[in-house]
Amino acid sequence: MAATLRELRGRIRSAGSIKKITKAQEMIATSRIAKAQARVEAARPYDREITNMLTELATASALDHPLLVQRENPRRAGVLVVSSDRGLAGAYNANVFRRSEELFSLLREEGKEPVLYVVGRKALSYYSFRNWDVTESWSGFSERPEYEHAQEIGETLVKAFMAGVDDEGDDAGADGILGLDELHIVFTEFRSMLSQSAIARRIAPMVVEYSEEDTNEPHTLFSFEPSAETLFDALLPRYVSTRIFAAMLEAAASESASRRRAMKSASDNADDLIKDLTLMANRERQSQITQEISEIVGGANALADAAKK
């Protein structure tokens, strides 16, 4: 019985140590959520306006630009999967991977070969273990992304996308870049502290919606200087980098929210486990004391009987 009691007390100490870790992780995640959420809210207007501006310019100029034109017989689609560098975030990464697998299946059904790019050590580990060919990866900043990180990623993807304009073969071009016909990004959209959703978006070619002409609404007239094509060439890298940066900010906020929720659940479970183990230990100790008392009483009775004889 004593060994069992020692075992229970050891398990209580272990659960207490785990609770300290999960509680600390919960507090860290909580402190980061507010800042991450503020960055998301600050980036959304710029992301929305640059997309709207390019849409209006495309409508006004009727430009035949690679950013706008759906290519004939697209063969390769670049997919950027945004994950985390660390674990302990519940189903955060699993949901992203599940959504990316759905996108891969859809692209293959359309006759397109997915070309994989990843952000975060978890995605690199996940796809490397499954023998996926990861074209390029970036890591070390999933919780605190900066625009410079998005620029670096965007430049890589834009080069591959523009290389796909004149790429008619299945091999890489002279510069060693495998051309892409589409660009997609899979990330976790931050909706609230309690709601995050893994989604996939196409960022190139842009989806331009031409609205029906309404004579009652004023229309913006554009005079392009330099040319509209030159303007789009200049804005394309910035547009892609902006969309990537906005997605990484959403993912960072979602990661912190998911980690906070997971660590709170783990802390609550540790509390429940400690209560259960403490109750078991008290019962075991009570049983041990009862047995010791019984042995003492039995011994005393035996001595009394011996004395009477």
UniProtKB/Swiss-Prot annotation:
Stretches that traverse the bilayer: none
Any Gene Ontology biological process: proton motive force-driven plasma membrane ATP synthesis
Coiled coil: none
Main subcellular location of this protein, as a coarse class: membrane
Pfam families: ATP-synt
Keywords attached to this entry: ATP synthesis, Cell membrane, CF(1), Hydrogen ion transport, Ion transport, Membrane, Transport
Membrane topology: Peripheral membrane protein
Superkingdom per UniProt: Bacteria
Presence of the UniProt keyword Ion transport in the record: yes
Location of the protein in the cell: Cell membrane
Keyword hit for Membrane: yes
GO CC terms of this entry: plasma membrane; proton-transporting ATP synthase complex
PANTHER family in the cross-refs: ATP SYNTHASE GAMMA CHAIN, ATP SYNTHASE SUBUNIT GAMMA, MITOCHONDRIAL
Family stated for the protein in its record: Belongs to the ATPase gamma chain family.
HAMAP family named in the record: ATP_synth_gamma_bact
Function field: Produces ATP from ADP in the presence of a proton gradient across the membrane. The gamma chain is believed to be important in regulating ATPase activity and the flow of protons through the CF(0) complex.
Subunit structure comment from the entry: F-type ATPases have 2 components, CF(1) - the catalytic core - and CF(0) - the membrane proton channel. CF(1) has five subunits: alpha(3), beta(3), gamma(1), delta(1), epsilon(1). CF(0) has three main subunits: a, b and c.
Name assigned to this protein: ATP synthase gamma chain
UniProt organism field: Mycobacterium sp. (strain KMS)
